[in-house]
Amino acid sequence: MRLAVGLLALASAQAALAFGLNDVAARAKQLAAKPYQAPPDTLPHELRELRYDQYREIRFKSDQAYWRRDKLPFELGFFHEGSYYDQPVKINEVSPAGAREIRFDPRLFDYGPVKLDPKHLRNLGFAGFRIHYPMNTPKYKDEVIVFLGASYFRGIGKGQVYGLSARGLAIDTALNSGEEFPRFTEFWIERPAANAKELTIYALLNSRRATGAYRFVIKPGTDTEVDVKAQLYMRENVSKLGIAPLTSMFFFGENQPASALDFRPEVHDSDGLSMLSGTGEWIWRPLTNPKRLLVSSFSTTNPGGFGLMQRDRAFSSYQEIGDRYELRPSAWVEPVGKWGAGRVELVQIPTPDETNDNVVAYWVPETPPKPQQPFNLEYRLLWQKEGDKKPGLSWVTQTRRSHGWTTKRPDERKPDDTIALVVDFEGPALAKLPPNAPVEPVFTADANGKIESIFGQPNTATGGWRVTVRLKRVDDDKPIELRGYLRSGGTGLSETWSYLLPPG
Protein backbone atom coordinates (compact mmCIF):
# COMPACT_ATOMS: atom_id res chain seq x y z
CA MET A 1 0.00 0.00 0.00
CA ARG A 2 2.84 2.40 0.89
CA LEU A 3 4.48 1.67 -2.48
CA ALA A 4 1.25 2.52 -4.28
CA VAL A 5 0.89 5.79 -2.37
CA GLY A 6 4.53 6.66 -3.08
CA LEU A 7 4.13 5.98 -6.78
CA LEU A 8 0.97 8.09 -6.84
CA ALA A 9 2.80 11.00 -5.19
CA LEU A 10 5.67 10.68 -7.66
CA ALA A 11 3.26 10.64 -10.58
CA SER A 12 1.55 13.77 -9.25
CA ALA A 13 4.89 15.57 -8.91
CA GLN A 14 5.92 14.57 -12.42
CA ALA A 15 2.56 15.74 -13.77
CA ALA A 16 3.01 19.12 -12.10
CA LEU A 17 6.50 19.46 -13.52
CA ALA A 18 5.28 18.41 -16.95
CA PHE A 19 4.87 22.12 -17.72
CA GLY A 20 7.13 22.81 -20.65
CA LEU A 21 7.77 24.58 -23.92
CA ASN A 22 4.64 23.18 -25.55
CA ASP A 23 2.47 24.90 -22.95
CA VAL A 24 4.06 28.27 -23.66
CA ALA A 25 3.95 27.62 -27.42
CA ALA A 26 0.20 27.04 -27.21
CA ARG A 27 -0.14 30.47 -25.56
CA ALA A 28 2.04 32.05 -28.27
CA LYS A 29 -0.03 30.46 -31.03
CA GLN A 30 -3.27 31.73 -29.49
CA LEU A 31 -1.82 35.23 -29.16
CA ALA A 32 -0.66 35.26 -32.78
CA ALA A 33 -4.19 34.49 -33.98
CA LYS A 34 -5.49 37.65 -32.31
CA PRO A 35 -4.79 41.33 -33.04
CA TYR A 36 -1.95 42.76 -30.98
CA GLN A 37 -2.94 44.63 -27.86
CA ALA A 38 -0.37 47.05 -26.50
CA PRO A 39 0.17 46.75 -22.75
CA PRO A 40 -1.66 49.37 -20.67
CA ASP A 41 0.28 52.36 -19.42
CA THR A 42 -0.15 51.95 -15.67
CA LEU A 43 3.19 53.03 -14.21
CA PRO A 44 2.80 55.97 -11.81
CA HIS A 45 4.26 59.24 -13.08
CA GLU A 46 6.79 59.59 -10.27
CA LEU A 47 8.33 56.19 -11.15
CA ARG A 48 8.30 56.86 -14.88
CA GLU A 49 10.08 60.19 -14.43
CA LEU A 50 12.94 58.79 -12.36
CA ARG A 51 16.35 59.51 -13.82
CA TYR A 52 18.36 56.36 -14.40
CA ASP A 53 20.74 57.20 -11.54
CA GLN A 54 17.72 57.62 -9.24
CA TYR A 55 16.21 54.34 -10.43
CA ARG A 56 19.44 52.53 -9.57
CA GLU A 57 19.05 53.68 -5.96
CA ILE A 58 16.08 51.29 -5.64
CA ARG A 59 17.79 48.04 -4.70
CA PHE A 60 16.45 44.57 -4.11
CA LYS A 61 17.25 43.37 -0.59
CA SER A 62 19.70 40.51 -0.99
CA ASP A 63 18.52 38.84 2.22
CA GLN A 64 15.10 38.48 0.57
CA ALA A 65 16.43 36.45 -2.37
CA TYR A 66 13.93 33.86 -3.55
CA TRP A 67 14.92 30.29 -2.49
CA ARG A 68 17.53 31.56 0.01
CA ARG A 69 15.64 30.21 3.00
CA ASP A 70 15.36 26.85 1.25
CA LYS A 71 19.16 26.75 0.84
CA LEU A 72 18.91 25.91 -2.86
CA PRO A 73 21.94 26.35 -5.18
CA PHE A 74 20.18 29.00 -7.28
CA GLU A 75 18.55 32.19 -6.00
CA LEU A 76 16.41 34.88 -7.63
CA GLY A 77 16.57 38.63 -7.19
CA PHE A 78 14.11 41.08 -8.75
CA PHE A 79 14.08 44.50 -10.41
CA HIS A 80 11.64 47.29 -9.59
CA GLU A 81 9.60 49.07 -12.24
CA GLY A 82 10.69 52.60 -13.08
CA SER A 83 12.57 54.87 -15.51
CA TYR A 84 13.18 52.98 -18.79
CA TYR A 85 11.64 49.80 -17.36
CA ASP A 86 8.03 50.89 -17.48
CA GLN A 87 6.24 47.57 -18.10
CA PRO A 88 5.80 44.72 -15.61
CA VAL A 89 6.58 41.09 -16.39
CA LYS A 90 4.76 38.23 -14.74
CA ILE A 91 7.13 35.77 -13.03
CA ASN A 92 6.02 32.28 -11.99
CA GLU A 93 7.69 29.45 -10.09
CA VAL A 94 7.11 25.94 -11.43
CA SER A 95 7.31 23.26 -8.73
CA PRO A 96 5.70 19.88 -7.97
CA ALA A 97 2.84 21.89 -6.48
CA GLY A 98 2.20 23.58 -9.84
CA ALA A 99 2.88 27.00 -11.33
CA ARG A 100 2.55 29.89 -8.86
CA GLU A 101 3.02 33.60 -9.49
CA ILE A 102 5.76 35.33 -7.50
CA ARG A 103 4.02 38.55 -6.52
CA PHE A 104 5.56 41.98 -6.18
CA ASP A 105 5.98 43.32 -2.66
CA PRO A 106 7.57 46.74 -1.98
CA ARG A 107 9.02 45.33 1.25
CA LEU A 108 11.49 43.39 -0.91
CA PHE A 109 13.21 46.64 -1.91
CA ASP A 110 15.36 49.31 -0.29
CA TYR A 111 14.34 52.67 -1.75
CA GLY A 112 17.30 54.59 -0.33
CA PRO A 113 16.98 58.34 -1.01
CA VAL A 114 14.11 57.82 -3.48
CA LYS A 115 10.88 59.08 -1.90
CA LEU A 116 7.71 57.56 -3.34
CA ASP A 117 4.07 57.70 -2.36
CA PRO A 118 3.32 54.27 -0.76
CA LYS A 119 -0.06 54.07 -2.48
CA HIS A 120 1.72 54.13 -5.86
CA LEU A 121 3.52 50.90 -4.96
CA ARG A 122 0.46 48.76 -4.35
CA ASN A 123 -0.29 47.42 -7.83
CA LEU A 124 3.16 47.23 -9.39
CA GLY A 125 4.93 44.22 -10.84
CA PHE A 126 8.55 43.26 -11.33
CA ALA A 127 10.50 44.75 -14.24
CA GLY A 128 12.77 41.69 -14.48
CA PHE A 129 14.95 39.33 -12.49
CA ARG A 130 18.48 38.09 -11.94
CA ILE A 131 19.84 34.63 -11.17
CA HIS A 132 22.55 33.91 -8.60
CA TYR A 133 24.73 30.80 -8.31
CA PRO A 134 28.05 30.01 -6.52
CA MET A 135 30.18 30.32 -9.64
CA ASN A 136 33.46 31.81 -8.39
CA THR A 137 33.52 30.54 -4.79
CA PRO A 138 31.35 27.92 -3.05
CA LYS A 139 30.24 30.31 -0.29
CA TYR A 140 29.01 33.23 -2.39
CA LYS A 141 26.26 33.23 -4.99
CA ASP A 142 27.36 35.41 -7.93
CA GLU A 143 25.07 37.00 -10.46
CA VAL A 144 25.00 34.75 -13.52
CA ILE A 145 22.33 36.16 -15.82
CA VAL A 146 19.81 39.02 -15.91
CA PHE A 147 16.52 39.31 -17.81
CA LEU A 148 15.52 42.98 -17.92
CA GLY A 149 13.85 45.15 -20.56
CA ALA A 150 12.12 44.10 -23.81
CA SER A 151 13.63 40.68 -24.67
CA TYR A 152 17.12 41.54 -23.42
CA PHE A 153 19.21 39.26 -21.25
CA ARG A 154 22.91 39.14 -20.48
CA GLY A 155 25.13 36.61 -18.77
CA ILE A 156 28.64 36.09 -17.47
CA GLY A 157 30.95 33.20 -16.75
CA LYS A 158 33.51 32.71 -14.02
CA GLY A 159 35.73 35.76 -13.45
CA GLN A 160 33.77 37.95 -15.88
CA VAL A 161 31.88 41.23 -15.52
CA TYR A 162 28.76 42.23 -17.44
CA GLY A 163 29.23 43.56 -20.95
CA LEU A 164 27.24 42.81 -24.08
CA SER A 165 23.63 41.59 -24.15
CA ALA A 166 21.56 39.07 -26.05
CA ARG A 167 17.92 39.34 -27.10
CA GLY A 168 15.13 36.93 -27.79
CA LEU A 169 14.34 38.39 -31.22
CA ALA A 170 15.05 41.41 -33.44
CA ILE A 171 12.61 42.72 -36.05
CA ASP A 172 13.45 45.19 -38.84
CA THR A 173 16.72 46.36 -37.32
CA ALA A 174 18.35 49.25 -39.23
CA LEU A 175 15.41 49.69 -41.62
CA ASN A 176 13.87 53.07 -42.41
CA SER A 177 10.51 51.76 -41.24
CA GLY A 178 11.87 51.57 -37.69
CA GLU A 179 12.76 48.66 -35.44
CA GLU A 180 10.18 46.65 -33.53
CA PHE A 181 11.23 45.47 -30.07
CA PRO A 182 9.43 42.31 -28.92
CA ARG A 183 9.29 41.84 -25.17
CA PHE A 184 9.12 38.92 -22.80
CA THR A 185 5.82 39.36 -20.97
CA GLU A 186 5.79 36.30 -18.71
CA PHE A 187 8.33 33.85 -17.29
CA TRP A 188 8.07 30.43 -15.69
CA ILE A 189 11.12 29.38 -13.65
CA GLU A 190 11.53 25.77 -12.57
CA ARG A 191 12.32 25.34 -8.90
CA PRO A 192 15.79 23.72 -8.81
CA ALA A 193 16.68 20.55 -6.93
CA ALA A 194 19.01 20.77 -3.92
CA ASN A 195 21.97 19.62 -6.04
CA ALA A 196 21.01 21.33 -9.32
CA LYS A 197 23.77 22.66 -11.57
CA GLU A 198 21.43 24.16 -14.17
CA LEU A 199 18.22 26.16 -14.17
CA THR A 200 15.36 26.06 -16.69
CA ILE A 201 13.32 29.13 -17.58
CA TYR A 202 10.39 29.46 -19.99
CA ALA A 203 9.32 32.78 -21.48
CA LEU A 204 6.44 34.14 -23.54
CA LEU A 205 7.34 36.79 -26.13
CA ASN A 206 4.92 39.24 -27.71
CA SER A 207 5.01 42.21 -30.09
CA ARG A 208 2.93 43.83 -32.81
CA ARG A 209 3.91 41.28 -35.46
CA ALA A 210 5.37 38.31 -33.58
CA THR A 211 4.84 35.98 -30.64
CA GLY A 212 7.11 33.26 -29.33
CA ALA A 213 7.74 30.59 -26.73
CA TYR A 214 11.27 30.19 -25.33
CA ARG A 215 13.07 27.71 -23.13
CA PHE A 216 16.40 28.72 -21.58
CA VAL A 217 18.53 26.11 -19.82
CA ILE A 218 21.23 28.02 -17.93
CA LYS A 219 24.46 26.24 -16.99
CA PRO A 220 26.84 28.49 -15.02
CA GLY A 221 30.56 27.85 -15.25
CA THR A 222 33.86 29.03 -16.67
CA ASP A 223 31.89 29.55 -19.87
CA THR A 224 28.27 30.02 -18.87
CA GLU A 225 26.10 28.15 -21.36
CA VAL A 226 22.51 28.98 -22.23
CA ASP A 227 20.69 26.39 -24.32
CA VAL A 228 17.89 28.17 -26.18
CA LYS A 229 14.93 26.49 -27.85
CA ALA A 230 12.07 28.53 -29.28
CA GLN A 231 8.92 28.38 -31.37
CA LEU A 232 7.90 31.61 -33.10
CA TYR A 233 4.65 32.72 -34.71
CA MET A 234 4.24 35.77 -36.96
CA ARG A 235 1.02 37.75 -36.88
CA GLU A 236 2.00 39.22 -40.23
CA ASN A 237 5.01 39.34 -42.52
CA VAL A 238 8.16 41.09 -41.36
CA SER A 239 10.82 42.57 -43.64
CA LYS A 240 13.77 41.31 -41.61
CA LEU A 241 13.78 38.74 -38.82
CA GLY A 242 16.89 38.74 -36.61
CA ILE A 243 17.54 35.39 -34.93
CA ALA A 244 19.78 35.11 -31.82
CA PRO A 245 20.56 38.85 -31.76
CA LEU A 246 23.56 40.17 -29.83
CA THR A 247 23.95 43.82 -28.80
CA SER A 248 27.26 45.43 -27.83
CA MET A 249 29.28 48.65 -27.69
CA PHE A 250 32.36 49.87 -29.55
CA PHE A 251 33.42 53.45 -28.85
CA PHE A 252 37.08 53.43 -29.90
CA GLY A 253 39.92 50.92 -30.14
CA GLU A 254 43.26 50.01 -31.65
CA ASN A 255 41.96 50.36 -35.22
CA GLN A 256 40.16 53.64 -34.45
CA PRO A 257 41.75 55.71 -31.65
CA ALA A 258 39.74 58.23 -29.63
CA SER A 259 38.91 61.47 -31.44
CA ALA A 260 39.64 63.45 -28.24
CA LEU A 261 42.42 63.10 -25.70
CA ASP A 262 41.60 60.12 -23.45
CA PHE A 263 43.79 58.21 -20.99
CA ARG A 264 42.08 54.98 -22.09
CA PRO A 265 43.60 53.43 -25.25
CA GLU A 266 40.42 51.45 -25.99
CA VAL A 267 36.79 51.48 -24.85
CA HIS A 268 34.56 48.64 -26.05
CA ASP A 269 32.55 45.63 -24.88
CA SER A 270 33.46 43.76 -28.08
CA ASP A 271 36.21 44.29 -30.64
CA GLY A 272 35.06 42.07 -33.50
CA LEU A 273 32.49 39.84 -35.16
CA SER A 274 33.61 36.24 -35.52
CA MET A 275 31.82 33.84 -37.83
CA LEU A 276 32.19 30.21 -38.90
CA SER A 277 30.53 29.80 -42.30
CA GLY A 278 28.79 26.68 -43.51
CA THR A 279 31.81 25.89 -45.69
CA GLY A 280 34.18 25.94 -42.71
CA GLU A 281 35.68 29.39 -43.32
CA TRP A 282 36.41 31.43 -40.21
CA ILE A 283 35.86 35.18 -40.71
CA TRP A 284 36.92 38.03 -38.42
CA ARG A 285 35.46 41.52 -38.87
CA PRO A 286 36.97 44.18 -36.54
CA LEU A 287 34.38 46.62 -35.23
CA THR A 288 34.33 50.39 -35.80
CA ASN A 289 32.43 53.43 -34.59
CA PRO A 290 31.30 54.81 -37.96
CA LYS A 291 30.28 58.35 -38.84
CA ARG A 292 27.03 57.02 -40.27
CA LEU A 293 25.06 53.78 -40.12
CA LEU A 294 26.90 50.75 -41.54
CA VAL A 295 25.22 47.41 -42.32
CA SER A 296 27.32 44.43 -43.45
CA SER A 297 26.11 40.97 -44.49
CA PHE A 298 27.87 37.60 -44.58
CA SER A 299 25.83 35.07 -46.54
CA THR A 300 26.16 31.33 -45.93
CA THR A 301 24.17 28.11 -45.57
CA ASN A 302 24.00 26.24 -42.26
CA PRO A 303 26.41 28.47 -40.31
CA GLY A 304 28.69 26.90 -37.73
CA GLY A 305 28.31 29.89 -35.45
CA PHE A 306 28.82 33.60 -34.96
CA GLY A 307 29.53 35.95 -32.09
CA LEU A 308 30.57 39.37 -30.89
CA MET A 309 33.92 38.79 -29.25
CA GLN A 310 36.24 40.59 -26.86
CA ARG A 311 39.58 39.15 -27.97
CA ASP A 312 41.86 41.72 -26.36
CA ARG A 313 42.24 40.56 -22.74
CA ALA A 314 45.07 42.86 -21.58
CA PHE A 315 44.30 45.45 -18.89
CA SER A 316 46.96 47.66 -20.47
CA SER A 317 44.79 47.95 -23.59
CA TYR A 318 42.01 49.66 -21.62
CA GLN A 319 43.48 51.16 -18.40
CA GLU A 320 39.97 51.32 -16.95
CA ILE A 321 39.98 50.33 -13.27
CA GLY A 322 36.24 50.68 -12.75
CA ASP A 323 34.76 49.14 -15.87
CA ARG A 324 37.32 46.38 -16.50
CA TYR A 325 36.68 45.97 -20.20
CA GLU A 326 39.24 43.16 -20.41
CA LEU A 327 36.96 41.00 -18.22
CA ARG A 328 33.84 41.47 -20.31
CA PRO A 329 32.55 38.33 -22.01
CA SER A 330 32.42 37.29 -25.61
CA ALA A 331 29.08 35.82 -26.72
CA TRP A 332 29.11 32.94 -29.20
CA VAL A 333 25.97 31.60 -30.90
CA GLU A 334 26.20 27.95 -31.95
CA PRO A 335 23.25 26.66 -34.00
CA VAL A 336 21.74 23.31 -33.06
CA GLY A 337 20.63 21.56 -36.23
CA LYS A 338 20.67 23.08 -39.70
CA TRP A 339 19.57 26.69 -40.06
CA GLY A 340 19.54 26.63 -43.86
CA ALA A 341 20.42 29.58 -46.08
CA GLY A 342 20.66 33.11 -44.80
CA ARG A 343 23.14 35.69 -43.60
CA VAL A 344 24.83 37.01 -40.51
CA GLU A 345 24.15 40.74 -40.44
CA LEU A 346 26.31 43.24 -38.58
CA VAL A 347 24.90 46.69 -37.79
CA GLN A 348 27.23 49.46 -36.57
CA ILE A 349 25.77 52.77 -35.40
CA PRO A 350 27.60 56.03 -34.62
CA THR A 351 27.91 56.79 -30.91
CA PRO A 352 29.37 59.88 -29.17
CA ASP A 353 30.24 57.97 -25.98
CA GLU A 354 30.34 54.55 -24.31
CA THR A 355 26.85 54.74 -22.79
CA ASN A 356 25.11 53.64 -26.01
CA ASP A 357 24.98 50.12 -27.40
CA ASN A 358 25.86 50.69 -31.05
CA VAL A 359 26.65 47.22 -32.42
CA VAL A 360 24.12 44.51 -33.30
CA ALA A 361 24.66 41.08 -34.89
CA TYR A 362 22.07 38.42 -35.72
CA TRP A 363 21.12 35.69 -38.19
CA VAL A 364 18.59 36.48 -40.93
CA PRO A 365 16.99 33.40 -42.54
CA GLU A 366 16.70 33.59 -46.32
CA THR A 367 13.11 32.34 -46.11
CA PRO A 368 11.26 34.15 -43.33
CA PRO A 369 8.46 32.36 -41.47
CA LYS A 370 4.93 32.76 -42.78
CA PRO A 371 2.17 34.23 -40.62
CA GLN A 372 0.49 31.76 -38.26
CA GLN A 373 3.00 29.00 -39.12
CA PRO A 374 5.36 27.72 -36.38
CA PHE A 375 9.04 28.57 -36.84
CA ASN A 376 11.35 26.47 -34.67
CA LEU A 377 14.90 27.36 -33.75
CA GLU A 378 17.51 26.04 -31.36
CA TYR A 379 20.97 27.25 -30.46
CA ARG A 380 23.60 27.30 -27.76
CA LEU A 381 24.77 30.66 -26.41
CA LEU A 382 28.17 30.76 -24.68
CA TRP A 383 29.37 33.65 -22.49
CA GLN A 384 33.14 33.24 -22.73
CA LYS A 385 36.51 34.69 -21.78
CA GLU A 386 39.64 32.52 -22.04
CA GLY A 387 37.66 29.85 -23.90
CA ASP A 388 36.67 32.13 -26.78
CA LYS A 389 35.80 30.26 -29.95
CA LYS A 390 38.67 30.57 -32.42
CA PRO A 391 39.80 28.73 -35.55
CA GLY A 392 42.21 25.84 -35.13
CA LEU A 393 44.86 27.43 -37.38
CA SER A 394 45.61 31.04 -36.44
CA TRP A 395 43.60 34.17 -35.87
CA VAL A 396 43.76 37.96 -35.91
CA THR A 397 44.89 39.51 -32.63
CA GLN A 398 44.86 43.16 -33.63
CA THR A 399 44.21 45.58 -36.49
CA ARG A 400 45.82 49.02 -36.43
CA ARG A 401 45.40 51.95 -38.79
CA SER A 402 47.94 54.60 -39.74
CA HIS A 403 48.98 56.87 -42.56
CA GLY A 404 51.32 55.17 -45.00
CA TRP A 405 54.99 55.96 -45.42
CA THR A 406 57.48 56.03 -48.24
CA THR A 407 60.00 53.51 -46.90
CA LYS A 408 60.27 50.70 -44.33
CA ARG A 409 63.44 52.18 -42.78
CA PRO A 410 62.49 54.13 -39.61
CA ASP A 411 65.20 56.75 -40.15
CA GLU A 412 63.89 57.55 -43.65
CA ARG A 413 60.12 57.28 -43.16
CA LYS A 414 57.95 60.06 -44.51
CA PRO A 415 54.14 60.11 -44.51
CA ASP A 416 52.60 59.69 -47.94
CA ASP A 417 49.04 59.79 -49.27
CA THR A 418 48.26 56.13 -48.54
CA ILE A 419 46.39 54.46 -45.69
CA ALA A 420 48.28 51.74 -43.82
CA LEU A 421 46.57 48.83 -42.08
CA VAL A 422 48.67 46.64 -39.79
CA VAL A 423 47.24 43.19 -39.02
CA ASP A 424 48.73 40.72 -36.53
CA PHE A 425 48.05 36.98 -36.61
CA GLU A 426 48.83 34.38 -33.95
CA GLY A 427 48.02 30.70 -33.46
CA PRO A 428 49.28 27.12 -33.57
CA ALA A 429 49.57 26.96 -37.36
CA LEU A 430 52.14 29.77 -37.28
CA ALA A 431 53.90 28.49 -34.16
CA LYS A 432 54.53 25.10 -35.79
CA LEU A 433 56.09 26.51 -38.98
CA PRO A 434 59.77 25.74 -39.63
CA PRO A 435 61.99 28.86 -39.28
CA ASN A 436 62.36 29.45 -43.02
CA ALA A 437 58.91 28.32 -44.16
CA PRO A 438 57.44 30.68 -46.78
CA VAL A 439 54.37 32.59 -45.58
CA GLU A 440 52.33 34.45 -48.17
CA PRO A 441 49.86 37.19 -47.18
CA VAL A 442 46.90 37.06 -49.58
CA PHE A 443 45.06 40.40 -49.34
CA THR A 444 42.57 42.03 -51.71
CA ALA A 445 40.41 45.17 -51.84
CA ASP A 446 37.21 46.02 -53.68
CA ALA A 447 37.04 48.49 -56.57
CA ASN A 448 37.18 51.49 -54.22
CA GLY A 449 40.56 50.48 -52.82
CA LYS A 450 43.84 50.49 -54.74
CA ILE A 451 46.48 48.42 -52.92
CA GLU A 452 49.96 49.94 -53.24
CA SER A 453 51.92 47.32 -51.28
CA ILE A 454 51.57 44.24 -49.06
CA PHE A 455 54.40 43.39 -46.69
CA GLY A 456 54.48 40.41 -44.31
CA GLN A 457 57.05 39.55 -41.68
CA PRO A 458 57.40 37.42 -38.53
CA ASN A 459 56.40 39.17 -35.33
CA THR A 460 59.23 38.07 -33.06
CA ALA A 461 57.54 39.64 -30.02
CA THR A 462 54.50 37.37 -30.26
CA GLY A 463 55.63 34.39 -32.33
CA GLY A 464 53.00 35.31 -34.89
CA TRP A 465 53.00 37.15 -38.20
CA ARG A 466 52.41 40.79 -39.11
CA VAL A 467 51.04 42.08 -42.41
CA THR A 468 51.11 45.75 -43.44
CA VAL A 469 48.85 46.82 -46.30
CA ARG A 470 49.19 50.25 -47.92
CA LEU A 471 46.31 51.42 -50.08
CA LYS A 472 44.57 54.44 -51.57
CA ARG A 473 40.88 55.25 -51.63
CA VAL A 474 39.33 55.91 -55.04
CA ASP A 475 36.19 57.67 -53.77
CA ASP A 476 36.40 59.31 -50.34
CA ASP A 477 32.63 59.11 -49.90
CA LYS A 478 32.54 55.32 -50.13
CA PRO A 479 33.87 52.57 -47.84
CA ILE A 480 36.50 50.01 -48.83
CA GLU A 481 36.00 46.27 -48.29
CA LEU A 482 39.20 44.31 -47.72
CA ARG A 483 39.91 40.62 -47.16
CA GLY A 484 43.09 38.82 -46.28
CA TYR A 485 44.60 35.64 -44.90
CA LEU A 486 47.93 33.81 -44.64
CA ARG A 487 48.97 30.72 -46.55
CA SER A 488 52.06 28.61 -47.06
CA GLY A 489 52.58 26.45 -50.11
CA GLY A 490 48.93 26.75 -51.06
CA THR A 491 47.70 25.74 -47.60
CA GLY A 492 45.73 28.24 -45.53
CA LEU A 493 47.28 29.19 -42.19
CA SER A 494 44.72 31.60 -40.75
CA GLU A 495 41.16 32.78 -40.55
CA THR A 496 39.99 35.41 -43.04
CA TRP A 497 40.42 39.01 -41.94
CA SER A 498 37.47 40.98 -43.34
CA TYR A 499 37.70 44.73 -42.85
CA LEU A 500 35.42 47.60 -43.74
CA LEU A 501 37.25 50.92 -43.97
CA PRO A 502 34.50 53.52 -43.46
CA PRO A 503 34.18 56.52 -45.79
CA GLY A 504 36.26 59.64 -45.29
Swiss-Prot record:
<protein>
    <recommendedName>
        <fullName>Glucans biosynthesis protein G</fullName>
    </recommendedName>
</protein>
<dbReference type="InterPro" id="IPR013783">
    <property type="entry name" value="Ig-like_fold"/>
</dbReference>
<dbReference type="GO" id="GO:0030246">
    <property type="term" value="F:carbohydrate binding"/>
</dbReference>
<keyword id="KW-0574">Periplasm</keyword>
<dbReference type="GO" id="GO:0051274">
    <property type="term" value="P:beta-glucan biosynthetic process"/>
</dbReference>
<dbReference type="InterPro" id="IPR011013">
    <property type="entry name" value="Gal_mutarotase_sf_dom"/>
</dbReference>
<keyword id="KW-0732">Signal</keyword>
<dbReference type="GO" id="GO:0003824">
    <property type="term" value="F:catalytic activity"/>
</dbReference>
<dbReference type="Pfam" id="PF04349">
    <property type="entry name" value="MdoG"/>
</dbReference>
<dbReference type="GO" id="GO:0030288">
    <property type="term" value="C:outer membrane-bounded periplasmic space"/>
</dbReference>
<dbReference type="InterPro" id="IPR007444">
    <property type="entry name" value="Glucan_biosyn_MdoG_C"/>
</dbReference>
<dbReference type="InterPro" id="IPR014718">
    <property type="entry name" value="GH-type_carb-bd"/>
</dbReference>
<comment type="function">
    <text>Involved in the biosynthesis of osmoregulated periplasmic glucans (OPGs).</text>
</comment>
<dbReference type="InterPro" id="IPR014756">
    <property type="entry name" value="Ig_E-set"/>
</dbReference>
<feature type="signal peptide">
    <location>
        <begin position="1"/>
        <end position="15"/>
    </location>
</feature>
<dbReference type="InterPro" id="IPR014438">
    <property type="entry name" value="Glucan_biosyn_MdoG/MdoD"/>
</dbReference>
<dbReference type="InterPro" id="IPR023704">
    <property type="entry name" value="MdoG_OpgG"/>
</dbReference>
<comment type="similarity">
    <text>Belongs to the OpgD/OpgG family.</text>
</comment>
<comment type="pathway">
    <text>Glycan metabolism; osmoregulated periplasmic glucan (OPG) biosynthesis.</text>
</comment>
